[in-house]
């Protein structure tokens, strides 16, 4: 059960990262639950930081 939960949160983080790299707005987050949303936003923020470094 814990592994499945962690995988779901990891997937949310990865999708947030991909959205950030693509330049999408953080308001585009598809998740409603707090944990998944925070993971998605964490990935999005990480991608935005990486975009600044790469530019």
From Swiss-Prot:
It comes from Escherichia coli (strain K12). NCBIfam families: PRK14563.1 (NF011162), Rmf_CrpP_fam (NF041886). Its main location: cytoplasm. Gene3D superfamilies: ribosome modulation factor like domain (1.10.10.620). It comes from the Bacteria. This is Ribosome modulation factor. It holds the Pfam family RMF. GO terms for cellular component: cytoplasm. One of its GO terms (molecular function) is ribosome binding. Disulfide bonds: none annotated. Disruption phenotype: Non-essential gene, 100S ribosome dimers are not formed, decreased cell viability during stationary phase. A quadruple raiA-hpf-rmf-sra knockout strain is significantly outcompeted by wild-type after 4 days growth. Very high sensitivity to aminoglycoside antiobiotic gentamicin in stationary phase cultures. Keywords: Cytoplasm, RNA-binding, rRNA-binding, Stress response, Translation regulation. When cells are transferred to rich nutritious culture medium, RMF is quickly released from 100S ribosomes, which dissociate into 70S ribosomes. It indicates that this interconversion is a major system regulating translation activity during the transition of growth phases. It is found in: Cytoplasm. During stationary phase, converts 70S ribosomes to an immature dimeric form (90S ribosomes) which are converted to inactive 100S ribosomes (a process called ribosomal hibernation) by the hibernation promoting factor HPF. Inactivates ribosomes by covering the peptidyl transferase (PTase) center of the 23S rRNA and the entrance of peptide exit tunnel. However crystallization with T.thermophilus 70S ribosomes shows it binds near the 3'-end of the 16S rRNA near the anti-Shine-Dalgarno sequence, where it would sterically hinder translation initiation. InterPro entries: Ribosome_modulation_factor, RMF_sf. Belongs to the ribosome modulation factor family. HAMAP family: RMF. Induction: Induced during stationary growth phase. Requires ppGpp for translation. Associates exclusively with 100S ribosomes. Contacts 16S rRNA, might contact ribosomal protein S18. GO terms for biological process: cellular response to stress; dormancy process; negative regulation of translation in response to stress.
């Amino acid at each position: 059960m814990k592994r499945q939960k962690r995988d779901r949160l990891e997937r949310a983080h990865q999708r947030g990262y991909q959205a950030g790299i693509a330049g999408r707005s953080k308001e585009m987050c598809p998740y409603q639950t707090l944990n998944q949303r925070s993971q998605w936003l964490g990935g999005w923020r990480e991608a935005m930081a990486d975009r600044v470094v790469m530019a």
